[in-house]
Design a protein with these regions (language model features):
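Short catalytic-loop micro-motif centered on adjacent basic/acidic residues
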Residues: 161-162, 216, 242, 271, ...
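Structural motif
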Residues: 107, 160, 239-241
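N-terminal glycine-rich anion-binding loop in soluble enzyme alpha/beta folds
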Residues: 160-221
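Mixed-charge interfacial surface used for oligomerization/domain docking
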Residues: 6, 10, 23-123, 136-139, ...
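Glycine-rich phosphate- or other oxyanion-binding loops that anchor nucleotides, phosphorylated ligands
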Residues: 212-213, 219-242, 246-258, 298, ...
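Conserved GHKL (Bergerat-fold) ATPase module
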Residues: 1, 8-20
Length: 442
């Protein structure tokens, strides 16, 4: 306790953000260190479901609540409190594991002391059979065993959804949902950052537009995906649906495929090419996660994603083509001619490939084209609209303007508005804005 109090005092004096975790046992600390990359609040909540057990011997007769303890009894402490007392080491270990290991238990850690006996050791092995168990020969004195029993959330769904930062999902989007986001890497003037983790969207745009930084992107490594898949299985998920940007736009899904092949559970991981990116990809992920929470099956969710990914229409305006030219997406001549004529291409995604929907003169005419397209589609059926932007306040103002022209249409329902588009799209396209629409019935 004195150590924790001192640590908290030191944390208050630090200029950096420091979180002091009030652990009760050694294996509490082990659990937090093992999961050090997990969100702190999420980790604290998960730890509250776990049991840290210490088995030792009583040094005197005593009584704790309704538990009578005699000297030399074997006692079991659970999360720092004495809960069990038996005459043999095997008996106390059996009683503890019979009570604490349930259908929600996913992993266990067993640290054996130098006075363990064969009977208790064999019994512990039998009772933990079928669980992922880490056995450590600690050779500690006085404590026969340290046990750590990790449990999943009893209300968690069986299916997790994994994606990457191209989805442009926020922490608020995924809160409470079975979603894991693997960040791509952003190279800014030779310095690598994890997208959305070590660099925010606003900082990326500042570096690109204000500092004229040299920016490149790279997909996660197969090891990144292997680690993410294993983490989800360790949490207790039985299946994973992994949704990523179009293979014609990024090599991310190929890295995920290699990562999947390195697991021993390939049949439990379904890889899906979203045939798009950003707004479309993010919506597929949110939709799939919602279906998982509602208890829909692995096959049902996969079929929905595969069917829906071709239902929508993405329309994006790129005000300045120089970024596409710098990235080699278009030639310098095309960029120069388009600039001289004030030509504004409206881009879409068709079967996973970026194509030109329409070329118009002037940015306002490009906006009007999108507005008319939305109105035309709404006459056929009710539609849902999402909008996004990236770059400067001008792009935000323009996408707000597009929506303001159609928002009073009773057949148009908004879902996500003014979503900021991040580094992966922005690094190649520069400032950008537009909409994604799809039939409401889908």
């Amino acid at each position: 306790k004195n150590v924790i109090t001192t640590a908290k005092m030191a944390a208050e004096k630090s200029k950096k953000t420091v979180v002091v975790l009030d652990t009760k046992t050694m294996l509490d600390g082990y659990y937090f260190l093992k999961n050090k990359d997990t969100d702190i609040d999420e980790l604290k909540e998960a730890a509250s479901r776990n049991y840290s057990v210490e088995i030792t011997k009583a040094v005197r007769d005593t009584k704790i609540e309704d538990l009578s303890i005699e000297k030399d009894d074997f006692i079991g402490l659970v999360n720092g409190k004495i809960k069990y007392a038996k005459k043999s080491l095997k008996e106390v270990a059996d009683a503890i594991l019979d009570d604490l290991v349930t259908k929600n238990t996913i992993t266990a850690v067993v640290v054996s002391g130098n006075e363990k006996d064969e009977a208790s050791q064999k019994s512990i092995e039998e009772k933990l059979a079928g669980l992922k168990t880490a056995n450590i020969n600690g050779n500690q004195e006085n404590y026969y065993y340290y046990l750590y029993i990790e449990n999943k959330d009893p209300n968690m769904p069986e299916i997790a959804i994994l994606t990457d930062s191209v989805s442009d999902l926020t922490d608020e989007d995924i809160e409470g949902l079975p979603i894991k986001v693997v960040p791509l890497r952003i190279d800014i003037n030779g310095e690598l950052y994890k997208d959305g983790v070590e660099i925010s969207k606003s900082e990326f745009w500042h570096q690109m537009l204000d500092n004229n930084a040299r920016i490149k992107t790279s997909q996660p490594s197969p090891q990144d995906f292997l680690n993410a898949y294993n983490k989800l299985f360790e949490k207790g998920y039985k299946k994973i649906i992994s949704i990523h940007p179009s293979s014609k736009l990024s090599g991310t899904i190929q890295a995920a495929k290699v990562g999947r092949s390195l697991t021993n559970r390939e049949n439990d991981i379904e890889l899906i090419d979203s045939l798009g990116a950003s707004l479309l990809q993010g919506f597929l992920v949110l939709g799939a996660a919602g279906k998982s929470v509602r208890g829909e099956s692995f096959t049902e969710i996969i079929n929905w994603v595969n069917n829906f990914r071709t239902k929508g229409k993405l329309l994006m305006i790129i005000p300045d083509l120089k970024y596409l030219e710098k990235g080699g997406r278009i030639g310098k001549a095309s960029s120069t001619i388009a600039g001289a004529l004030n030509m504004k291409p409206i881009l879409t995604v068709n079967q996973g490939e970026v194509t030109v929907e329409k070329k118009v003169l002037g940015e306002r005419n490009a906006q009007k084209y999108i507005e008319k397209y939305i109105e035309r589609e709404s006459k056929k059926q009710s539609i849902v609209l999402m909008s996004g932007w990236g770059g400067t306040p001008t792009e935000l103002e323009n996408v707000v303007r597009i929506y303001s022209e159609v928002e009073n249409n009773p057949k148009i329902n908004s879902l996500i508005l003014n979503r900021e588009i991040g580094a992966v799209i922005g690094a190649h396209a520069g400032p950008v804005y537009g909409v994604f629409i799809f039939p409401r019935l889908s």
